[in-house]
Amino acid sequence: MHHTQHNTMANSIPKLLATQNPFSVSLSIFFFLLLLINNVKSDSLSFNFPKFDTDALNIVIDGDAKTTGGVLQLTKKDQFGNPSPHSVGFSAFFGAIQLSDKQSGKVADFTTEFSFVVNPKGSQLHGDGFAFYIASLDYDFPEKSSDGGFLGLFDKETAFNTSKNSIVAVEFDSFANEWDPNSPHIGIDINTIESSISVPWPIDRQPQGTIGKARISYNTASKDLSVFVTYPNSPAKVDVIVSYPIDFASVLSEWVYVGFSGATGQVAETHDILSWSFVSNL
């Protein structure tokens, strides 16, 4: 299959939608179009990006995100590679994924793996983090004010309003906001920026630039979403494990899209995804 990178949503949708903010309304309509033109009725789906080539991707990017040097860069850097404050970036796999089937009652098992680097580039302060998300096709990403602790997923109007949201995320949160634990943490978020469960994330104990590896999996039988994070080449041998029960059929629509978001606030760090794979079986 030929893979095409989609740098702006307006280039991929009718001109009527080009006037909409590409980070909100048009995303919802865009992914509804994906449901019509770019899904395959199948019991299984898989994709693999060993690296992110700028000219050979099935990836949607928006905000400050871009692909460069084989890397998916979620938030902005300056000309010297240093992280920029108040940056928000977004990416998604270019295809709708069937997570559940109401008629049969089935919910998909899935596993996604990715490698990443979070680097404050010389600073001792981290901020703010990134997330892997699964969102219903009609989920409205915020138009603005989603930087900092909102991680690009929410704004102050939606962050704690679970009735407005239809998204599940695993957050890699490096800055303690008022709704957070008092240290860097990895959390599972269900329709809100406040994690249902979280565990410490020793990002501040890793040498700057260290590559992390994450595996996120969902087991339909147990309904557990499980997260495992490790730094295999780091002298600080600390693994992170967390899991939480989720009934995806009651939280999200049958068809979803998956991807990453990242954000910085006044304090900044880089958020780079080096590789990404995903497999699901319904």
UniProtKB/Swiss-Prot annotation:
May be involved in arbuscular mycorrhizal (AM) symbiosis with AM fungi. InterPro entries: ConA-like_dom_sf, L-lectin, Lectin_LegA_CS, Lectin_legB_Mn/Ca_BS, Legume_lectin_dom, Leguminous_Lectin. This is Lectin 5. It comes from Medicago truncatula (Barrel medic). It is found in: Membrane. Glycans are attached at residue 161. The keyword DNA-binding does not apply. It is a single-pass membrane protein.
